Amino acid sequence: NYFMEMDAAAYKDRYESDDVGPGEPFINRPYKKLRPTFEEQFGWERQRSIKSWIYKSFYDQKTSIHWKLFLFLFNLTPTKQMDMGGHKFMFIYIKLLFNSSISSYKDFIYNLTIDPSMLNYLNLQLSRKETPDENYAREVQELFTVGKRPFSKFTEEDVRGVARALVGWEFDYEAIVYSEGHESVVNFRPWNHDTEDKIFSSFYKNKVIKGKEGDAGAQELNEVIEMIFETEEACVY
């Protein structure tokens, strides 16, 4: 009844207002390269500005599907807000969520995997080919894509396989934090990549991701994402 009683002007104001993405100018001032102060390095005032903007947007949102999906992703794929990258890592992450809210979820998971905040939060940044960290490999399956439903039968070997395939991605802290601008700088380090084959369970149709050397190793991330999203459970989830 409430919506039936709305006049055209109220409807237009509620449903057709443009969404506003994260602003950019305040973030462009570079830090001092040599011995920055704690405030300069982490930009608390800018971090507060981003947090204030995003939470006010949550509180004041109308019924925009864009903001509803943004809030969904914000809760589904959290990172640590006050991490080592300060306001720049936070800004890059928030902008990724905003731009991904009404686009391909598969593309979002790819970009989320190499987001600096996520690399730091779920330990891919510190993962090594001799001791691959399984934290993100587990969460990307259990929480972000196929879930823990009865038919999501990925195995511990699958977790280890994904972890091995993703070893080698690292953000460039110096380039992000101490440079002007707000762009993500993430590189693939071939010397830290597991070049052996990764063999997966029947849940993934016994997929084999061939180990690759050099820069070609970066392609294994694409193969992992494709493998996960080819499952029926990813669609159901």
Regions found by a protein language model. Name each.
Residues E40-W44, Q61-I65, M82-G85:
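Cytochrome P450
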Residues N1-Y2, F72:
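Residue-level detector of alpha-helical secondary structure
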Residues Q47-S52, S57-L73:
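Hydrophobic alpha-helical hairpins/lids featuring a short glycine-rich hinge
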Residues F3-M4, A10-P36, I50-I54, G86-Y237:
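Active-site substrate-binding loop specific to GH73 endo-beta-N-acetylglucosaminidase modules
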Residues Y59-L69, P78, N99-Y105:
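Short, solvent-exposed loop/edge-beta patches enriched in aromatic
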Residues N75-D83, M118:
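Short helix-loop boundary/capping segments at the starts of domains
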